[in-house]
């Protein structure tokens, strides 16, 4: 569980980007999960030693999809649920390093943790 609590430093830091507020989030958990699924092997301490191009492309695509506050909050909820499903095999250190390893520039380092209140903390 401690490894999962480190989710904040995870991959998913990059989904928090500035954007205008709209009335309804257009982002679904299916979209979030499908974009991050290629990262699973890397994040679960398998034999994969780098995120790989499919993982990096998925992260870039997701980063470009979270345009509104509601989208970012929805992505936060989806990411927290997905990380719970991965379970204790999740490597938080690898997750935290994905933006750097993929060459993705993050404007700031908002962290998503299991105790993050996605509806109020993520703007």
Curated annotation (Swiss-Prot):
User: What does this protein do, in the record's words?
Assistant: Plant non-specific lipid-transfer proteins transfer phospholipids as well as galactolipids across membranes. May play a role in wax or cutin deposition in the cell walls of expanding epidermal cells and certain secretory tissues.
Task: Return any one Pfam family short name.
Answer: Tryp_alpha_amyl
SUPFAM superfamilies given in the database record: Bifunctional inhibitor/lipid-transfer protein/seed storage 2S albumin
Q: Name one GO molecular function term.
A: lipid binding
- Keyword annotations from UniProtKB, A to Z: Disulfide bond, Lipid-binding, Signal, Transport
Q: What is this protein called?
A: Non-specific lipid-transfer protein 7
Q: PANTHER family attached here?
A: NON-SPECIFIC LIPID-TRANSFER PROTEIN 2-RELATED (PTHR33076)
Gene Ontology biological process terms from the UniProt entry:
lipid transport
Q: List the disulfide bonds.
A: 29-78, 39-55, 56-102, 76-118
Endpoints of the signal sequence: 1-25
The entry assigns this protein to a family as follows: Belongs to the plant LTP family.
Lineage of the source organism? Eukaryota, Viridiplantae, Streptophyta, Embryophyta, Tracheophyta
Keyword DNA repair on entry: no
Identify the InterPro entries for this entry: Bifun_inhib/LTP/seed_sf, Bifunc_inhib/LTP/seed_store, Plant_nsLTP
Q: Which residues cross the membrane?
A: none
